[in-house]
């Protein structure tokens, strides 16, 4: 073969190889440490309450029940000889558990309705009201249904906590700051001697329950 032609052929082969190499996509950089979706830790858990998750025992009290205006999707019941109580959750059409504590797995009152229960449709997500709260400390608080309001300097207590004289101020939309994955709230404890409240203490919210 003519040396010039041989040289040209070699040059063409080298050019072709260079073109192939430059057109091959770069392999992923294994040292870049690419990371997939991250798990958000400590985010507040919103739980749809299942009344069948709580075991019931004993004889129910007879009472009359109507739809609750405090917690849509639940009932308000009046036991015979007792005080009105809510929220109450139907177990079929024959019994209701009132003021359940999902953390402890118990309830305040078991009701047997004296008349057929009114139809109570489940609330839409924008009308779902938080009725029970567990804070990061383990303290639990339930929505207040008592007729007598508890008024503090910062507002009316919307939730009453397991520790005596301890409250969360505001309703389901104002008592909690849900602007971050972990919600926060403020705890107020009254001095039973003076009726005054100590400065509010910020607290993280671990779990909340809705109907």
List each language-model region with its residue ranges:
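Bacterial N-terminal signal peptides that target proteins for export
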Residues: 1-10
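Mitochondrial intermembrane space
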Residues: 27-211
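Phosphate-binding and hydrolysis-coupling loops of NTP-dependent motor/remodeling domains
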Residues: 12-14
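Bacterial signal peptide processing site
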Residues: 21-23
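C-terminal motif of bacterial Sec signal peptides marking the signal peptidase cleavage site
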Residues: 16-19
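Intrinsic-disorder/low-complexity regions
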Residues: 1, 25-28
């Amino acid at each position: 073969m003519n040396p010039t032609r041989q040289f040209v052929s070699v040059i063409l082969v080298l050019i072709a190889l260079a073109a192939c190499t430059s057109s091959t996509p770069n392999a992923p950089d294994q040292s870049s440490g690419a990371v997939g979706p991250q798990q958000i830790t400590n985010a507040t858990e919103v739980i749809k309450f299942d009344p069948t998750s709580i075991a019931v025992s004993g004889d129910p009290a007879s009472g009359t029940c109507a739809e609750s205006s405090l917690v849509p999707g639940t009932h308000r019941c009046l036991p015979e000889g007792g005080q009105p109580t809510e929220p109450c959750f139907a177990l079929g059409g024959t019994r209701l558990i009132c003021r359940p504590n999902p953390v402890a797995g118990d309830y305040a009152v078991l009701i047997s309705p004296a008349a057929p229960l009114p139809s109570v449709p489940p609330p839409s997500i924008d009308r779902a009201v938080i009725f029970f709260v567990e804070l990061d400390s383990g303290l639990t608080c339930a929505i207040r249904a008592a007729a007598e309001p508890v008024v503090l300097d910062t507002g009316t207590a919307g939730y009453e906590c397991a520790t005596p004289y301890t409250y969360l101020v505001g309703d389901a939309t104002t008592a909690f700051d849900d602007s971050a994955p972990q919600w926060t709230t403020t705890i107020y404890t009254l001095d039973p001697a003076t009726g005054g409240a100590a400065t509010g203490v910020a607290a993280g919210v671990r779990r909340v329950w809705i109907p």
